From Swiss-Prot:
Cellular location(s): Plastid, Chloroplast
One GO MF term attached to the UniProt entry: ATP binding
Protein name per its UniProtKB record: Ribulose bisphosphate carboxylase/oxygenase activase, chloroplastic
Organism lineage: Eukaryota, Rhodophyta, Bangiophyceae, Cyanidiales, Cyanidiaceae
SMART domains in alphabetical order: AAA
Family assignment from sequence similarity: Belongs to the CbxX/CfxQ family.
Binding site for ATP: P75, G76, T77, G78, K79, T80, T81, V82
Cellular-component GO terms for this entry: chloroplast
Oligomer and partners: Forms homooligomers. Forms heterohexameric rings with the nuclear-encoded Rca subunit consisting of 3 of each nuclear- and plastidial-encoded subunits that alternate in the ring.
Transmembrane segments: none
Main localization category: plastid
Described purpose of this protein according to its UniProt entry: Required for the expression of ribulose 1,5-bisphosphate carboxylase/oxygenase (RuBisCo). ATPase involved in the activation of red-type RuBisCo, which tends to form inactive complexes with its substrate ribulose 1,5-bisphosphate (RuBP). Catalyzes the release of RuBP from inhibited RuBisCo in an ATP-dependent manner. Activation of RuBisCO involves the ATP-dependent carboxylation of the epsilon-amino group of lysine leading to a carbamate structure. The nuclear-encoded subunit plays a more critical role in activase function than the plastidial-encoded subunit.
Length: 293
């Protein structure tokens, strides 16, 4: 077919509406605080895939966009949430048949003795076919300091599937950026098959406070203005501590604050309780954290 003389047309707006990917992108905006660079990158990937679909409809050759991805960033920055939305986008655009997300770590793929790794990895891949396989902390698959480690066998099987069955499965490798960079350097064959790299920045203290307020609202709780100020101080201190995990750490802190609130209420058995009493986190419920002692 001559591209220049073809009179075929395709309506971008109609195709865009039919795929309903705008709903997914809107959900992403609504559910995730901040992360503008991540949202922009996901929109770019979605646009590329939609254009590729339109090209195929007009009989043009597919650009064969690489679908395997790398999500890098600290824990609790929304990588799994975005992976779930990406699976939905890929499904709505027809790149995968089912659209489900399977999340695994090294333990789900690698066996402890000879002959155990291949069946474990193949079973995971079988379960993930037609969807997206999200491998968290993927760098733990590769342990060059241990010659008897079976992670390399799992990587080899993943490579074969990424190359030969890329129409049926998308793999997302995830983890800390520095460790993932070393992982790709050590496994160039794998790195060459990962076309889309998305970096997830850490949240700011103010963004984490907003996330915390949303988490509480979803459980029909609220913080007093004074409690919000104290919780912001808590976040700033907690960010300086080891093992900080962004939104995950915020959720854990709020769970403990609700526990202290319940104990505070329980300590006044004679008091008649209002709805406000039951839904409100006070500053003292946060100040009793060890970070303030």
């Amino acid at each position: 077919m001559s591209v220049q003389t073809s009179q075929q047309t395709v309506n971008l707006q109609t195709e865009f509406k039919q795929t309903q990917i705008q709903e997914v992108l809107d959900d992403l905006d609504r559910e995730l605080i901040g992360l503008q660079t991540v949202k922009t990158r996901i929109r770019e990937i979605a646009a590329l895939l939609l254009v590729d679909r339109l090209r195929q409809k007009l009989g043009l050759s597919s650009s064969n966009p690489g679908l395997h991805m790398s999500f890098t960033g600290s824990p609790g920055t929304g990588k799994t949430t975005v992976a779930r939305k990406m699976a939905d986008i890929l499904y709505r655009l027809g790149y995968i048949k089912k659209g489900h997300l399977i999340t695994v770590t090294r333990d789900d793929l690698v066996g402890q003795y000879i002959g155990h790794t291949a069946p474990k990895t193949k079973q995971v891949l079988k379960n993930a076919m037609g969807g997206v396989l999200f491998i968290d902390e993927a760098y733990y698959l590769y342990r060059p300091d241990n010659e008897r480690d079976y992670g390399a066998e799992a990587i080899e099987i993943l490579l074969q599937v990424m190359e030969n069955q890329r129409d049926d499965l998308v793999i997302i490798f995830a983890g800390y950026k520095d460790k993932m960079d070393r992982f790709y350097t050590s496994n160039p064959g794998l790195a060459s098959r990962v076309a889309n790299h998305v970096n997830f920045p850490d949240y700011t203290p103010e963004e984490l406070l907003m996330i915390g307020k949303i988490m509480l609202q979803e459980q029909q709780y609220q913080m007093t203005p004074e409690a919000e100020k104290v919780f912001l101080q808590y976040i700033q201190r907690r960010m300086e501590q080891p093992h900080f995990a962004n939104a995950r750490s915020v959720r854990n802190a709020l769970d403990r604050a609700r526990l202290r609130q319940a104990n505070r209420i329980f300590a006044t058995p004679g008091k008649k309780l209002t709805k406000f009493d039951l839904v409100t986190i006070q500053a003292e419920d946060i100040l009793k954290s060890r970070l303030f002692q």
